A protein has these predicted regions:
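"Short basic amphipathic alpha-helical interaction patches in structured regions
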Residues: 147-153
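Metal-dependent nuclease catalytic regions and adjoining charged, substrate-binding loops involved
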Residues: 9-25, 152, 164, 168-261
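Short, small-residue-rich loop/turn micro-motifs
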Residues: 138-139, 180
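Metal-dependent nuclease catalytic cores that hydrolyze phosphodiester bonds in DNA/RNA
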Residues: 1-134, 140-147, 261
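Short, conserved glycine- and acidic-residue-centered signature motifs
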Residues: 154-158
Length: 261
C-alpha cells in the first residue's frame, strides 16, 4: 500500500461545507503519481551507472530481460515521486550555482561507452590545474546525511556511479556534494582513483561484460539463489511481474557483489 502524501487527515474531521480536504489530498496524490513515467514495454540498450550496485541493478536476469525488452511497471507512490522531484530541483539549483565558478566546465554531460554498453549523464565536470574532476550531486534525509558526514564516505552504489564516470573520462579525482534535505546543509566528499577504487570499478566492468556477453549469446539467467518478490534484489524491480511469470532460465550468473567500503 502506498504512503499517504498528506498525513493529518486520519485524526481530525473537517467541519467546512465547501472545501473537502480528503478529496483535495486524493487529487494531490493522483497528481504526483501522474507525473511518473507511464508503464509499458521498454528495451534497454545499455547499463545505467545510477542503477548499478543497488537492488535489481545487481541482477543479471534483470539486465538480460531489460536488454531483451520487458514490461516496466513503476510502483513508486506519491511520496517517492515527491522525493525524486525534490532531488531534481536540488540538482538544478546547485548546478546553477556551481556553473558560476571559473573551474566549471559542463553539467549533465552525456557519456557513452561501447563495451560494455553504458550510458549516463555526469552532474558536474570541473577542471583544476588542467585536470578533469567529476562531481556528483546527491540529496539525503537527515539520518542518511548524518551517516555520510560521520563516515565521510558515499554509499556504495553512489561510489560505483562516480567511479564509472571517472574511469570513462580518465579522471583521477572526483567528489560528491551531499545536500541535507531538511536543512540544505552541504558536505563535500572527495574521491580519488586509488588502487582500491580501481579494483572496485574494474571488477564492476568485468561483471557487466559477462552479463552483456551472456545476453548476446541468448541464455536467460535464472533468478538469484533464494530470490523472492519481497526480498532484494527483487523488491523494487520494475519488471518483477514479468520476471516471475516467465521461464526459469538456463544459466546461473552470479549477482554483482557490492563491495564493502
Amino acid at each position: 500500500m502506498g504512503r499517504d502524501i498528506v498525513k493529518n487527515l486520519k485524526f481530525k474531521k473537517h467541519a467546512g461545507k465547501h472545501f473537502d480536504p480528503e478529496k483535495f489530498a486524493q487529487l494531490l496524490d493522483e497528481s504526483y503519481r501522474n507525473t511518473k513515467r507511464a508503464d509499458g514495454e521498454m528495451t534497454k540498450k545499455s547499463f545505467s551507472p545510477s542503477t548499478l550496485g543497488y537492488g535489481h541493478g545487481t541482477c543479471p536476469r534483470y539486465w538480460y530481460m531489460a536488454f531483451s525488452g520487458a514490461m516496466f511497471i513503476d510502483d513508486n507512490d506519491a511520496v517517492a515521486v515527491a522525493n525524486m522531484a525534490q532531488g531534481t530541483q536540488a540538482h538544478e539549483r546547485l548546478q546553477k550555482l556551481i556553473s558560476t565558478m571559473p573551474e566549471w566546465k559542463a553539467e549533465e554531460e552525456e557519456i557513452v561507452n561501447e563495451y560494455p554498453p553504458i550510458r549516463g549523464f555526469i552532474d558536474l565536470i570541473m577542471e583544476y590545474d588542467a585536470e578533469t574532476v567529476i562531481g556528483e550531486i546527491k540529496t539525503a534525509k537527515q539520518e542518511v546525511w548524518d551517516q555520510r558526514q560521520a563516515e565521510m564516505k558515499p554509499t556504495t552504489n553512489h561510489l560505483l556511479q562516480l567511479l564509472t564516470y571517472m574511469k570513462l573520462k580518465n579522471a583521477k579525482e572526483g567528489f560528491f556534494l551531499y545536500e541535507n534535505k531538511n536543512t540544505q546543509e552541504l558536505i563535500v566528499i572527495p574521491v580519488s582513483m586509488n588502487e582500491k577504487n580501481k579494483a572496485i570499478i574494474e571488477e564492476a566492468f568485468t561483471w557487466m561484460c559477462e552479463v552483456w556477453d551472456n545476453f548476446k549469446e541468448g541464455d536467460l539467467p535464472m533468478r538469484p539463489a533464494g530470490a523472492s518478490k519481497s526480498k532484494m534484489p527483487c523488491t523494487y524491480c520494475p519488471i518483477k511481474k514479468e520476471c516471475y511469470a516467465g521461464l526459469t532460465g538456463t544459466v546461473q550468473i552470479e549477482s554483482y557483489k557490492v563491495p564493502k567500503l
